[in-house]
Regions:
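Bacterial N-terminal signal peptides that target proteins for export
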Residues: 1-8
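Bacterial N-terminal signal peptides
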Residues: 8-18
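A domain-start/cap signature at the N-terminus of enzymes
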Residues: 20-91, 141, 170-194, 198-200, ...
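Active-site machinery of serine-nucleophile hydrolases
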Residues: 91, 95-158, 261-284
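Solvent-exposed loop/turn segments at secondary-structure junctions
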Residues: 97-101, 131-136, 173-177, 198-202, ...
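Alpha/beta-hydrolase fold nucleophile elbow
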Residues: 161-173
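The feature captures the conserved acid-bearing segment of alpha/beta-hydrolase catalytic domains
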Residues: 191-282, 286-289
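Catalytic active-site module of serine/aspartate enzymes centered on a nucleophile-bearing elbow/loop
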Residues: 298-313
Length: 313
């Protein structure tokens, strides 16, 4: 895997291994950093929700229903075995893809993130909401999924020991599309979002609040469904999902984004951004998938990089 740090401007130096190192020069493309509150600093002290210290009662792992925006909605919540009511923990929303469901998220360990949480003994509450309340996996013409997300988040904060400064969202395909949509509207609630093959069309998009948010994204160079570029004229495609957050996080001159040309994927982190609000993009030669492995590796690097990204905070 090639992991690049893109600096604007930069002086590149090639090592004998062919890895691009760089020395940073003053960056005229970066905005003056806004003040960052304590809850957004890296490795900040957890911010406990109102549910911290409360007994779980009958609110336990499993399938739940609630009424939201006039619709009966369902979700599955997974409260970890090492949950401690007095210690606020991370909360991760996993949004399913077309053809999938909330149960799919449970079956695939919430895009593999639960496997890493258990391995590292990190208590994480996982939530898999159910879409399919209209003709699409997630709603394309109104904000009812956004209201559903807000209602769930409010409920979980009231019932559970949630670290309100470490709420995350991830998804693949249509799940990435709704995750991206939420990333434009819930920057004050979401610490970071991970999108695997996102698209910024055929989905409800709110007016972007243009607030900073940590963002990780992947797109295959041969993806014909959620294309890296669907339309330059309309700024549609995974490329523009990345560029939107680069700009919202502080860069005024948008960079060229390196794309993979060999079977080994290329991950780029864009410099000139506050460390609290990184933007990272993983490119690979391949199609529409959330599972990708480099030659000779049995590790799904998308899941691994997502976990590492979320754990920065």
């Amino acid at each position: 895997m090639k992991h690049r740090h893109l600096l604007i401007p930069l002086i590149a130096v090639m090592t004998c291994c062919g890895v691009c190192l760089a020395q940073e020069s003053p960056d005229p493309a970066a905005k003056a950093p806004a003040s960052i509150d304590a809850a957004s600093k890296l490795k900040n002290t957890p911010v406990p929700s109102a549910g911290t210290g409360k007994e779980l009662g009958d609110f336990k792992s499993g399938k739940h229903t609630m009424t939201s925006a006039g619709l009966e909605r369902e979700y599955i919540i997974d409260i970890p075995e090492n949950y401690d009511k007095d210690k606020p923990c991370r909360l991760v929303f996993a949004m399913h893809m077309m053809g999938g469901s909330m149960q799919t998220m449970v079956d695939n360990k919430f895009y593999g993130l639960k496997t890493y949480a258990e391995k590292d003994k990190i208590p994480v509450i996982f939530v898999a909401p159910q879409g399919y309340t209209d003709s699409s996996p997630w709603r394309g013409r109104d904000d009812k999924d956004h209201i559903f997300f807000a209602d769930m988040l409010k409920l979980f904060k009231e019932k559970l020991a949630v670290d309100t400064s470490r709420v995350f969202c991830c998804g693949f395909s249509f799940g990435a599309m709704v995750s991206y949509s939420l990333s434009l509207d819930f920057q004050d609630d979401l610490r970071a979002v991970a999108c695997y093959a996102p698209a910024n069309w055929n989905i409800y998009l709110p007016e972007n609040k243009h607030k900073p948010l940590a963002f990780y994204s992947t797109t295959g160079t041969e993806d014909g469904l959620c294309k890296y570029v669907n339309s330059d004229a309309r700024k549609e495609g995974g490329k523009y999902c990345v560029l939107t957050h680069i700009e919202d996080n502080g860069l005024t001159e948008l960079p060229e984004i390196p794309l993979a040309t060999t079977p080994t994927h290329v991950t780029t982190e864009f410099k000139g951004l506050p460390e609290e609000y990184p933007v990272v993009f993983g490119s690979f030669v391949g199609g529409h998938t959330d599972t990708a492995k480099d030659p000779g590796s049995d590790v799904n690097w998308i899941s691994k990089e997502t976990w590492d990204f979320f754990m920065r905070f």
